[in-house]
């Protein structure tokens, strides 16, 4: 499983992606050469510098996999140390857990969408009118400033490795809105991932 080096080369903080459960599966890929059936047990690995984030992510993702009939184990239950694991330690952890597959999630990039809301131009108040008419036209001409809203998203990549296969067998990319509710965001993020892997008969 030498390709773990690619997935583990960048230690990033998954904390940035977690928040509300707004998540979109934007792309998937499957190795056309892979002919194996569904995996039996998955080790879930979240790449994060924050131990609490990693644990919540791995726990939630593993729970959702188990809810779909897939045996899963969070990596921190085997390797509780914080920070990046060596490749040897990761391979030993996979063997110790009895998993035949590893699911690794990493952050790829942050994106910002900007939404500008421009109100209609104000209507000038009429000079030659009664006070009540002037009052009404004044409301019609009430000025609202242009509003600018920014929506922050994080793009993450989840890759499935099968222990006896030399290369990744599947990968999916999601775009998730930032927030602070780690568990809820992980649930929203994991749901389309699990559905896509089930569709491909990988889990």
Language model region names:
Residues 27-31, 56-67, 126-129, 202-203:
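Short low-complexity stretches enriched in small and charged residues
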Residues 1-8:
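Bacterial N-terminal signal peptides that target proteins for export
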Residues 41-115:
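N-terminal segment of the mature soluble domain
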Residues 85-160:
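Surface-exposed short loop/turn segments
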Residues 20-41, 49, 143-203:
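C-terminal/domain-edge helix-coil "capping" segments
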